[in-house]
Protein backbone atom coordinates (compact mmCIF):
# COMPACT_ATOMS: atom_id res chain seq x y z
CA UNK A 1 0.00 0.00 0.00
CA UNK A 2 2.81 2.37 0.88
CA UNK A 3 4.48 1.67 -2.45
CA UNK A 4 1.30 2.47 -4.33
CA UNK A 5 0.84 5.72 -2.44
CA UNK A 6 4.42 6.73 -3.15
CA UNK A 7 3.97 5.98 -6.81
CA UNK A 8 0.79 8.08 -6.90
CA UNK A 9 2.51 11.01 -5.20
CA UNK A 10 5.40 10.78 -7.63
CA UNK A 11 3.03 11.01 -10.59
CA UNK A 12 1.27 14.00 -9.03
CA UNK A 13 4.60 15.72 -8.49
CA UNK A 14 5.63 15.02 -12.07
CA UNK A 15 2.38 16.50 -13.36
CA UNK A 16 2.86 19.60 -11.26
CA UNK A 17 6.50 19.90 -12.25
CA UNK A 18 5.60 19.73 -15.98
CA UNK A 19 4.96 23.12 -17.57
CA UNK A 20 1.29 23.73 -18.14
CA UNK A 21 0.28 24.97 -21.65
CA UNK A 22 -0.15 28.73 -21.77
CA UNK A 23 -3.76 29.83 -21.74
CA UNK A 24 -4.99 31.77 -24.80
CA UNK A 25 -5.67 35.41 -24.13
CA UNK A 26 -9.19 36.56 -24.78
CA UNK A 27 -9.76 39.08 -27.56
CA UNK A 28 -10.69 42.59 -26.49
CA UNK A 29 -12.21 45.63 -28.18
CA UNK A 30 -8.77 47.14 -28.62
CA UNK A 31 -7.66 44.11 -30.60
CA UNK A 32 -10.69 44.50 -32.85
CA UNK A 33 -9.92 48.18 -33.39
CA UNK A 34 -6.32 47.36 -34.28
CA UNK A 35 -7.49 44.74 -36.75
CA UNK A 36 -9.91 47.20 -38.40
CA UNK A 37 -7.27 49.91 -38.67
CA UNK A 38 -4.82 47.42 -40.20
CA UNK A 39 -7.37 46.34 -42.81
CA UNK A 40 -8.27 49.94 -43.67
CA UNK A 41 -4.65 50.99 -44.05
CA UNK A 42 -3.95 47.92 -46.18
CA UNK A 43 -6.93 48.75 -48.44
CA UNK A 44 -5.76 52.34 -48.78
CA UNK A 45 -8.63 54.06 -47.02
CA UNK A 46 -6.42 55.37 -44.21
CA UNK A 47 -2.88 56.68 -44.44
CA UNK A 48 -0.40 54.47 -42.53
CA UNK A 49 0.00 55.56 -38.93
CA UNK A 50 3.37 56.21 -37.35
CA UNK A 51 4.74 53.48 -35.19
CA UNK A 52 3.78 53.96 -31.61
CA UNK A 53 6.42 54.38 -28.96
CA UNK A 54 7.87 51.29 -27.44
CA UNK A 55 5.97 51.83 -24.23
CA UNK A 56 2.35 52.81 -24.08
CA UNK A 57 -0.14 52.42 -21.31
CA UNK A 58 -2.34 50.24 -23.51
CA UNK A 59 0.50 47.89 -24.50
CA UNK A 60 2.10 47.46 -21.09
CA UNK A 61 1.37 44.19 -19.30
CA UNK A 62 0.62 46.03 -16.10
CA UNK A 63 -2.38 47.66 -17.66
CA UNK A 64 -3.64 44.28 -18.84
CA UNK A 65 -3.27 42.90 -15.34
CA UNK A 66 -4.97 45.92 -13.86
CA UNK A 67 -7.80 45.72 -16.37
CA UNK A 68 -8.29 42.07 -15.59
CA UNK A 69 -8.23 42.68 -11.86
CA UNK A 70 -10.25 45.91 -11.86
CA UNK A 71 -13.99 45.93 -11.70
CA UNK A 72 -16.78 47.74 -13.39
CA UNK A 73 -15.01 51.11 -13.53
CA UNK A 74 -12.22 49.78 -15.71
CA UNK A 75 -14.73 48.05 -18.00
CA UNK A 76 -16.57 51.34 -18.47
CA UNK A 77 -13.33 53.14 -19.28
CA UNK A 78 -12.41 50.52 -21.88
CA UNK A 79 -15.85 50.82 -23.50
CA UNK A 80 -15.54 54.60 -23.74
CA UNK A 81 -12.06 54.23 -25.19
CA UNK A 82 -13.34 51.72 -27.72
CA UNK A 83 -16.19 54.04 -28.75
CA UNK A 84 -13.78 56.90 -29.22
CA UNK A 85 -11.51 54.65 -31.30
CA UNK A 86 -14.47 53.64 -33.47
CA UNK A 87 -15.40 57.28 -33.99
CA UNK A 88 -11.83 58.02 -35.00
CA UNK A 89 -11.88 55.15 -37.48
CA UNK A 90 -15.15 56.38 -39.01
CA UNK A 91 -13.75 59.89 -39.34
CA UNK A 92 -10.62 58.57 -41.01
CA UNK A 93 -12.67 56.48 -43.43
CA UNK A 94 -14.84 59.49 -44.33
CA UNK A 95 -11.77 61.65 -44.91
CA UNK A 96 -10.17 59.00 -47.07
CA UNK A 97 -13.33 58.69 -49.20
CA UNK A 98 -13.59 62.46 -49.66
CA UNK A 99 -9.91 62.67 -50.57
CA UNK A 100 -10.24 59.90 -53.14
CA UNK A 101 -13.37 61.44 -54.68
CA UNK A 102 -11.76 64.88 -54.88
CA UNK A 103 -8.63 63.42 -56.44
CA UNK A 104 -10.77 61.60 -59.03
CA UNK A 105 -12.65 64.80 -59.82
CA UNK A 106 -9.41 66.71 -60.23
CA UNK A 107 -8.03 63.97 -62.42
CA UNK A 108 -11.17 64.15 -64.63
CA UNK A 109 -10.97 67.93 -64.94
CA UNK A 110 -9.63 68.99 -68.36
CA UNK A 111 -6.52 71.05 -68.79
CA UNK A 112 -6.33 74.51 -70.38
CA UNK A 113 -5.64 73.11 -73.85
CA UNK A 114 -8.56 70.74 -73.64
CA UNK A 115 -10.79 73.60 -72.46
CA UNK A 116 -9.74 75.65 -75.49
CA UNK A 117 -10.50 72.70 -77.75
CA UNK A 118 -13.89 72.25 -76.16
CA UNK A 119 -14.77 75.93 -76.65
CA UNK A 120 -13.67 75.74 -80.29
CA UNK A 121 -15.81 72.64 -80.82
CA UNK A 122 -18.80 74.33 -79.20
CA UNK A 123 -18.41 77.41 -81.39
CA UNK A 124 -18.08 75.27 -84.53
CA UNK A 125 -21.12 73.23 -83.56
CA UNK A 126 -23.05 76.46 -82.99
CA UNK A 127 -22.07 77.77 -86.43
CA UNK A 128 -22.97 74.45 -88.10
CA UNK A 129 -26.29 74.36 -86.29
CA UNK A 130 -27.09 77.89 -87.51
CA UNK A 131 -26.22 76.97 -91.09
CA UNK A 132 -28.30 73.80 -90.89
CA UNK A 133 -31.25 75.74 -89.50
CA UNK A 134 -31.04 78.22 -92.38
CA UNK A 135 -30.93 75.36 -94.89
CA UNK A 136 -33.94 73.70 -93.26
CA UNK A 137 -35.88 76.96 -93.34
CA UNK A 138 -35.07 77.45 -97.04
CA UNK A 139 -36.13 73.89 -97.83
CA UNK A 140 -39.37 74.39 -95.89
CA UNK A 141 -40.10 77.57 -97.83
CA UNK A 142 -39.39 75.86 -101.14
CA UNK A 143 -41.49 72.86 -100.18
CA UNK A 144 -44.35 75.14 -99.14
CA UNK A 145 -44.00 77.24 -102.29
CA UNK A 146 -43.90 74.20 -104.59
CA UNK A 147 -47.47 72.97 -104.11
CA UNK A 148 -48.74 76.55 -104.13
CA UNK A 149 -47.09 77.16 -107.47
CA UNK A 150 -48.42 73.90 -108.86
CA UNK A 151 -51.95 74.76 -107.68
CA UNK A 152 -51.72 78.23 -109.18
CA UNK A 153 -50.40 76.77 -112.45
CA UNK A 154 -53.29 74.32 -112.61
CA UNK A 155 -55.83 77.06 -111.95
CA UNK A 156 -54.27 79.36 -114.54
CA UNK A 157 -54.20 76.55 -117.10
CA UNK A 158 -57.85 75.74 -116.50
CA UNK A 159 -58.85 79.40 -116.70
CA UNK A 160 -56.90 79.91 -119.93
CA UNK A 161 -58.54 76.84 -121.44
CA UNK A 162 -61.99 78.13 -120.48
CA UNK A 163 -61.21 81.55 -121.95
CA UNK A 164 -59.99 80.02 -125.21
CA UNK A 165 -63.10 77.86 -125.45
CA UNK A 166 -65.29 80.92 -124.99
CA UNK A 167 -63.32 82.81 -127.60
CA UNK A 168 -63.61 79.93 -130.09
CA UNK A 169 -67.36 79.58 -129.57
CA UNK A 170 -67.84 83.31 -129.97
CA UNK A 171 -65.77 83.33 -133.17
CA UNK A 172 -67.78 80.42 -134.59
CA UNK A 173 -71.05 82.12 -133.71
CA UNK A 174 -69.90 85.37 -135.27
CA UNK A 175 -68.80 83.62 -138.46
CA UNK A 176 -72.12 81.83 -138.68
CA UNK A 177 -73.92 85.09 -137.98
CA UNK A 178 -72.04 86.98 -140.70
CA UNK A 179 -72.43 84.21 -143.30
CA UNK A 180 -76.20 83.91 -142.80
CA UNK A 181 -77.25 87.54 -142.29
CA UNK A 182 -78.00 89.32 -145.64
CA UNK A 183 -77.99 92.84 -144.18
CA UNK A 184 -74.38 93.28 -143.10
CA UNK A 185 -72.43 91.31 -145.69
CA UNK A 186 -69.59 93.67 -146.52
CA UNK A 187 -68.87 95.92 -143.55
CA UNK A 188 -69.53 93.53 -140.68
CA UNK A 189 -67.35 90.77 -142.16
CA UNK A 190 -64.28 92.94 -141.80
CA UNK A 191 -65.25 93.93 -138.24
CA UNK A 192 -65.78 90.33 -137.19
CA UNK A 193 -62.51 89.15 -138.68
CA UNK A 194 -60.67 91.94 -136.87
CA UNK A 195 -62.51 91.05 -133.68
CA UNK A 196 -61.50 87.39 -134.02
CA UNK A 197 -57.87 88.40 -134.50
CA UNK A 198 -58.01 90.66 -131.45
CA UNK A 199 -59.62 87.94 -129.35
CA UNK A 200 -57.02 85.39 -130.41
CA UNK A 201 -54.22 87.81 -129.55
CA UNK A 202 -55.82 88.53 -126.19
CA UNK A 203 -55.96 84.80 -125.44
CA UNK A 204 -52.29 84.39 -126.35
CA UNK A 205 -51.37 87.33 -124.14
CA UNK A 206 -53.26 85.79 -121.25
CA UNK A 207 -51.41 82.50 -121.68
CA UNK A 208 -47.99 84.18 -121.81
CA UNK A 209 -48.72 86.29 -118.73
CA UNK A 210 -49.89 83.25 -116.80
CA UNK A 211 -46.78 81.26 -117.66
CA UNK A 212 -44.29 84.05 -116.84
CA UNK A 213 -45.86 85.33 -113.62
CA UNK A 214 -47.02 82.29 -111.64
CA UNK A 215 -47.00 84.06 -108.30
CA UNK A 216 -49.72 86.53 -109.37
CA UNK A 217 -51.86 84.00 -111.21
CA UNK A 218 -54.41 83.65 -108.45
CA UNK A 219 -55.19 87.38 -108.27
CA UNK A 220 -54.35 88.92 -111.67
CA UNK A 221 -55.33 86.34 -114.30
CA UNK A 222 -58.84 85.37 -113.23
CA UNK A 223 -60.75 85.37 -116.53
CA UNK A 224 -64.50 85.96 -116.38
CA UNK A 225 -67.18 86.97 -118.85
CA UNK A 226 -67.03 90.60 -117.74
CA UNK A 227 -63.24 90.73 -118.29
CA UNK A 228 -63.65 89.37 -121.83
CA UNK A 229 -66.32 91.97 -122.58
CA UNK A 230 -64.10 94.78 -121.35
CA UNK A 231 -60.98 93.57 -123.20
CA UNK A 232 -62.71 93.03 -126.52
CA UNK A 233 -64.02 96.57 -127.00
CA UNK A 234 -65.85 95.65 -130.26
CA UNK A 235 -69.41 96.54 -131.18
CA UNK A 236 -70.41 92.93 -131.91
CA UNK A 237 -70.42 92.11 -128.21
CA UNK A 238 -73.04 94.78 -127.69
CA UNK A 239 -75.28 93.66 -130.58
CA UNK A 240 -78.82 92.99 -129.41
CA UNK A 241 -80.67 90.53 -131.65
CA UNK A 242 -82.48 88.31 -129.16
CA UNK A 243 -86.00 89.06 -127.93
CA UNK A 244 -84.71 89.18 -124.34
CA UNK A 245 -83.02 92.50 -125.06
CA UNK A 246 -79.60 91.35 -123.84
CA UNK A 247 -76.45 91.61 -125.99
CA UNK A 248 -74.56 88.78 -127.63
CA UNK A 249 -71.68 88.89 -125.06
CA UNK A 250 -70.11 85.68 -126.38
CA UNK A 251 -73.00 83.45 -125.36
CA UNK A 252 -74.11 80.66 -127.76
CA UNK A 253 -76.93 81.60 -130.10
CA UNK A 254 -79.02 80.00 -132.87
CA UNK A 255 -80.46 81.51 -136.07
CA UNK A 256 -84.07 81.39 -137.15
CA UNK A 257 -84.64 79.88 -140.62
CA UNK A 258 -87.27 82.42 -141.69
CA UNK A 259 -86.40 85.81 -140.19
CA UNK A 260 -82.61 85.14 -139.71
CA UNK A 261 -82.71 86.52 -136.17
CA UNK A 262 -80.20 85.19 -133.68
CA UNK A 263 -81.67 84.00 -130.39
CA UNK A 264 -79.84 82.87 -127.26
CA UNK A 265 -80.05 79.14 -126.64
CA UNK A 266 -81.15 79.82 -123.08
CA UNK A 267 -84.00 82.03 -124.33
CA UNK A 268 -85.05 79.39 -126.87
CA UNK A 269 -84.85 76.75 -124.09
CA UNK A 270 -82.44 74.61 -126.10
CA UNK A 271 -79.64 72.62 -124.54
CA UNK A 272 -76.15 72.74 -126.01
CA UNK A 273 -76.18 68.99 -126.44
CA UNK A 274 -79.49 69.01 -128.39
CA UNK A 275 -79.15 71.86 -130.91
CA UNK A 276 -81.55 71.28 -133.87
CA UNK A 277 -80.53 71.75 -137.49
CA UNK A 278 -83.59 73.83 -138.32
CA UNK A 279 -84.89 76.40 -135.85
CA UNK A 280 -87.89 78.73 -135.95
CA UNK A 281 -88.35 81.50 -133.42
CA UNK A 282 -91.65 81.78 -131.61
CA UNK A 283 -92.81 84.71 -133.77
CA UNK A 284 -92.27 82.76 -136.96
CA UNK A 285 -93.99 79.77 -135.44
CA UNK A 286 -96.99 81.92 -134.51
CA UNK A 287 -97.16 83.45 -137.98
CA UNK A 288 -96.88 80.07 -139.66
CA UNK A 289 -99.60 78.68 -137.40
CA UNK A 290 -101.95 81.54 -138.26
CA UNK A 291 -101.36 81.11 -142.02
CA UNK A 292 -102.10 77.39 -141.78
CA UNK A 293 -105.35 78.11 -139.97
CA UNK A 294 -106.36 80.65 -142.62
CA UNK A 295 -105.69 78.16 -145.42
CA UNK A 296 -107.93 75.61 -143.79
Swiss-Prot record:
It is found in: Nucleus; Cytoplasm. Residues 50-80 are annotated as: Disordered. Its main location: nucleus. A zinc finger (PHD-type) spans 239-287. Signal peptide: none annotated. One of its GO terms (cellular component) is nucleus. GO terms for biological process: autophagy; negative regulation of autophagosome assembly; negative regulation of autophagosome maturation; positive regulation of protein ubiquitination. It holds the Pfam family PHD_2. One of its GO terms (molecular function) is zinc ion binding. Keywords: Autophagy, Cytoplasm, Metal-binding, Nucleus, Zinc, Zinc-finger. The keyword Mitochondrion does not apply. It comes from the Eukaryota. Gene3D superfamilies: Zinc/RING finger domain, C3HC4 (zinc finger) (3.30.40.10). Acts as a negative regulator of autophagy. Belongs to the PHF23 family. The PHD-type zinc-finger domain is required for negative regulation of autophagy. This is PHD finger protein 23A.
